[in-house]
Amino acid sequence: MKVLMVDKNKCIGCHQCELWCGTEIASVSKELHRAIHEEPHPVPRVYVEGKNFALQCRHCEEAPCIEACPNGTMRRDPETGLVYVYEPTCIACWMCVMVCPFGIINPSSSMKVAIKCDRCRNMGYPICAEVCPTQAIQLVDRKDYRKKAFEPPCSVKG
């Protein structure tokens, strides 16, 4: 399975990931100059926290959002392992929002459904990784992610 890896040392806080996620995934028009005037406003599924750290769904192996959802709206794609929202059955109870350990799941602008990163599963490749100018967001194999995550920081010898 592939996961999104964010290198906080490469992220410059430009918010391109948010901008394009909101435009390409959440807007009706799919055009930036029109999307900013849409009602309800398009809500991106990835967020830049503080100055330079993009946050997105981790697609947890034991996803609390799936367990908490009372009617099966939060689902896992059996082929990709991605957790996604099946919007037609969402009752806006916000149980998934409350239990997400990363604070990634949010109500939509209309407050009718929950929204979260599904890694652009209908596009084939996450738009946030595609548009990141510094390649701070990358799609990598889970094993490579674990290797990188546990690499000791580089040291300077004096």
Whereabouts are the PLM-identified features?
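A short, small-residue-rich loop immediately preceding and capping a beta-strand
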Residues: 72
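Membrane-helix interface segments
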Residues: 80-81
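Glycine-/small-residue-rich active-site loops that bind phosphorylated ligands and cofactors
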Residues: 12-13, 124
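N-terminal signal-anchor transmembrane alpha helix
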Residues: 12, 18-22
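Flanking helices and flexible, charged tails adjoining ferredoxin-like Fe-S electron-transfer domains
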Residues: 1, 5-7, 22, 27-68, ...
